[in-house]
Amino acid sequence: MFKRKQKPDGEVPKAKKTFVQGVLEWVKAFAFAFAVMVPLRGSIIDWFDVPSGSMEPTIVPGDRIFVNKLAYGLRVPLTKEPCRWITRWGSPERGDVVICYSPEAPDHIRLVKRVVAVGGDTLELRAGKLVINGTEAAYEPLDEEVQKQIDGGRFGIMRFALETTDDNAHPVVRAPNDRDVLIMERGGQFISQWKEPAWTLSNFGPVTVPAGKVFVMGDSRDKSRDSRFFGFIDETQVVGRSPAVVFSFLLQRGPRLSIEWDRFFRAIP
């Protein structure tokens, strides 16, 4: 009933690929993908897994955040500290959420923090309130419904405030009381970076940021290890800016995977 399709005269039938040829094709495909992804992640875009709560409530543990590595310039791929730049066309600004290398362990540890002061700025903390160039930030308590939209109710009520400066407005976690926490190392030794024994996490400064440097802090002011501990960060050590959370999940006991759907593709203020 059905006739086989006749091959045109002179057409040579295709030889079947051997197992080795098939493997080689896969190897070539993976090599090409690797060759594209390495410079892409090294110089253009990347992601960062957030392990701690120092940026709560803006960024929480389990978030995977997008990193724009072209925000301030084009970086040589696969270089760490000191970062090597092909060219730079911008600098971090107040309010930027950035990824930078830790001055305490610059060879492998990256941090996510917020830039609160840039070169030439004078910064001070008075009873936990941020003061930039003599102007104190405004703080507005957030009501219960707004807090639930931010964190899903995971941190409790009335711990957040909206911190507003001339450049930016974002939620921060305020200390639960007005006590001062001395800046101490493990073992009770005072941090010698600033050599000011009267300074604390909530009463700090004033300090003037040198040109080409930035002062960074976590939005969770009472549990962030930041420039109050390790000092200024050179602008060239800021890897990129983070504009958004891509997705969020935590591996809990069991093991059980907790997916935070409401945090997917959330903009970072």
Predicted regions, residues:
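Soluble "head" domains of membrane/secretory-pathway proteins
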Residues: 2-22, 46-49, 57-269
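Hydrophobic membrane-insertion alpha-helices, especially the h-region
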Residues: 25-43
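Aromatic-capped interface at the extracytoplasmic side
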Residues: 39-53
